[in-house]
């Protein structure tokens, strides 16, 4: 993702949970989104000519990729974009023979947890104090059948 795209998205993403609740600054989010990591590429999510959000995939994690970041801007939420991203995430994993898909979501982010569970992810662990002291993250896993 380009620095310009990251800087455009970051202030908007910083105003929605979980980043708002965790007090992530636009500068911190922009730095994360613009970072160049070969094993964790960042992508802008486009809808037509508009940028609707961002996604980061950590490719090699526990026999499958980890969806490290998924942020959809409010005007684009509840339109199937997140589902399309999850379908893409799964198809990319299947292409490389991954056995698992991994996601973590904040315990308070009930809407995200419900979304992931509707897409076949199951809760496998509670990670206390991972991001912020006193909060928990829920690790979710989706097993992919071997072909």
Predicted regions and their residues:
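C-terminal "cap" of GNAT-fold acetyltransferases
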Residues: 99-102, 106-113, 118-119, 125-147
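Hydrophobic residues at beta-strand termini and immediately following loops
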Residues: 1, 124
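Acetyl-CoA-dependent GNAT
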Residues: 2-69, 73-75, 83-88, 92, ...
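Active-site acidic-Proline motif in GNAT/NAT acetyltransferases
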Residues: 73-75, 79, 107-108
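Internal amphipathic alpha-helical segments of the cytochrome P450 catalytic fold
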Residues: 64, 78, 112-113
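Short, functionally important structural connectors and interaction interfaces within domains
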Residues: 62, 122-123
